[in-house]
Amino acid sequence: KKDGYPVDSGNCKYECLKDDYCNDLCLERKADKGYCYWGKVSCYCYGLPDNSPTKTSGKCNPA
């Protein structure tokens, strides 16, 4: 398992305002839990499966 910022198919993080939104998003991706990291206004997940995509150094390419 790993921790990190979940990303969509374009390697873009999920913006957020509420922890509930991120927790649900992370649970859908089979993580243990998640929250909205205010410093980056992005969802952060704990305990994601190793094969779940997370933010890397690549650029965000919105669909």
Swiss-Prot record:
Localization annotation: Secreted
Entry keywords, A to Z: Disulfide bond, Ion channel impairing toxin, Neurotoxin, Secreted, Toxin, Voltage-gated sodium channel impairing toxin
Domain LCN-type CS-alpha/beta: 2-61
Disulfide bonds: C12-C60, C16-C36, C22-C43, C26-C45
GO MF annotations, alphabetized: sodium channel inhibitor activity; toxin activity
Record has Disulfide bond as a keyword: yes
Superkingdom field: Eukaryota
InterPro entries, per the entry: LCN-type_CS_alpha_beta_dom, Scorpion_toxin-like, Scorpion_toxin-like_sf, Scorpion_toxinL, Scorpion_toxinL/defensin
Tissue: Expressed by the venom gland.
Keyword Ribonucleoprotein: no
Recorded coiled-coil stretches: none
One BP term from GO: defense response
Family the UniProt entry places it in: Belongs to the long (4 C-C) scorpion toxin superfamily. Sodium channel inhibitor family. Alpha subfamily.
Domain remarks: Has the structural arrangement of an alpha-helix connected to antiparallel beta-sheets by disulfide bonds (CS-alpha/beta).
UniProt name for this protein: Alpha-toxin CsE5
Organism per entry: Centruroides sculpturatus
